[in-house]
Amino acid sequence: EKYCPNAKVVYDQFHLISNFGRMVINAIRIRLSNQCEENGNKDAASLFKGSRSLLLTRNSRLPDNRRTKLDDILKFYTDLNKANELKELLSEIFQSTSKEEAQKLWSAWYKLASESDVKEITKFAETQNENYKDGITNAGIYHIGTSVLEGINNEIKVIKRVAFGFRDFDYFFLRIMDAFRGKPAFA
């Protein structure tokens, strides 16, 4: 806040979709697999084996043979089908061209997620809406991923390592600013 008072928090698509996949889709997959095994339905439980990457991959990137297997899973399990649809809709927020459009898409996504009656989805939606909504909708203005930021952080670590530490933070900050002089600003 002191050095970058106008900075806006922006969450990138990769990490949000990754969290959705881990906290929602994978949790539902494991829950359904365990239910099938408890009910003695080994064939249905085996359908979930090796399906993790299949469920986490964007539908548009799946080849036809894998898309058929995904359709077979989604046809029988409505919770996974809802999660898959919401995963695809969540990605659309990051394609928006303005904050207003991103907010509209977020509101629609949040409404669908809240009304899904799937505990994993509603919990994720509540957490994101309470804590991260502004960072997600800011993606409509600032189309930046963490790859650029990770590169900047790496360069900062190099400055710190070469200097063998700084005793004065203000001087360290000046060295960082000097390293990026003339490079385009992202915020």
List the predicted regions and their residue ranges.
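Short alpha-helix plus adjacent loop in nuclease-associated cores
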Residues: L16-E37
